[in-house]
């Protein structure tokens, strides 16, 4: 049940009546611009519409005059109790109380299905997230993007999409060569040789385990093998071992990908060449000289002809190089090929989660997808910013290359998986997030996950102690008349809209914000009962009022439970 859509349908029906009377002009283009939404300020009413503003441009009248025409017709909508016009032409209206009371009934009858909306209609969507380089275990810094991608996948599944979770294994390129060389040193160390870890290599102690595994399996044989043979063995074993570690960390976070795609395998299968051939056939490849990149020292750059992709034809800032000086493919060429592979697998809609340091990839990848699909496929690139990990306000540092970093296992053992999954979504993904190990386990209103869970647990406690109540169809909800009760009901009515908007924008943090607001509003209402016995949820001598308030509380629990399950968090029935 989406109240906005319901009221919007009523308004559209009335606009068609006015159109039939030749009082306005109406067509699909105009209707596509129609907005019905909640105002930012409650003083403006329950909902507003821009109908008069958009229609005024077509009927060539002042928006306020158009609003007066609409006012007379919209006043006939039975769900609307009060309607007004404000400059420059917005129409604000309040809904009849019975509409809000029906929300309580709907939530209690539909339970966690109350906010089910089908905007995906079974369409396939590919969400690629994490894709950490397999050069070491994941550290807790990777958790933000991982949780974002997984919760987004849950959300899109809920609204009717067929979701595939994908991990791109960057198992080709320079960083893998560095990994192999680093592991070989650890193997030599396991074989009893003295080693010196040079600059630029991975010094992490986690590589000692791989070196020991190689020594236990091959003894000193690798020392005698030719370089190509031993490096292949080291590469294969190292990548498998490290990818297994990454998968174990993902399991700790409650995440399981459906597909793992190897960059090296794409290269072996000549997918880059096939992709370049396709772009050549589209006349989107040429040889040219790029301008010197900004910030590049003169002695480090020389102009030269390169194979270039006409990405500026599709909104990019500059055309992009596809080949290096030595003839090997650039990273971007591999990225294009990977997305060509996704499109070839039938994905017309893709979502890619990247760290904010990859912001320069946004335009070029969007351009590539447009070019490869003839503008039929789309890619939505969501950037996540860094997480500042704090211990009572003091920053905790981590670095893969230094060999010392905070592991996902460390954090989950300390605060729990539910805390990690919720806190990682308490800010918009592209904003910096502070994660304080002390504050996230506090049992106070300053800890959002505690406050939300506490609201759910309070309702469960209320239900355990509640007397027998009236059937919902026999309950008169008009007794819920206080300002705070109506405010909570109106907030619960927004749940469907929050789900739909979060899915359409690929912004699951909106759900976090909403659940926190629901919890705060419920706790505030509960607090009034501590000061005034007549404001409590259970009134011994009034079975109808008790029933109405319990159904309201139960609606809160259903909404919170539904939201937490999108995060794969178990709603608590009692706090420990």
Curated annotation (Swiss-Prot):
Any one of the GO CC terms: cytoplasm
Catalytic activity: tRNA(Arg) + L-arginine + ATP = L-arginyl-tRNA(Arg) + AMP + diphosphate
Pfam families named among the record's database cross-references: Arg_tRNA_synt_N, DALR_1, tRNA-synt_1d
UniProt GO molecular function: arginine-tRNA ligase activity; ATP binding
Keyword Lyase part of the UniProt annotation: no
Keywords, alphabetical: Aminoacyl-tRNA synthetase, ATP-binding, Cytoplasm, Ligase, Nucleotide-binding, Protein biosynthesis
Location of the motif 'HIGH' region: 132-142
Presence of the UniProt keyword Heme in the record: no
Subunit structure of this chain's protein: Monomer.
Entry's family note: Belongs to the class-I aminoacyl-tRNA synthetase family.
PANTHER family: ARGININE--TRNA LIGASE, CYTOPLASMIC (PTHR11956:SF5), ARGINYL-TRNA SYNTHETASE (PTHR11956)
UniProt name for this protein: Arginine--tRNA ligase
Gene: argS
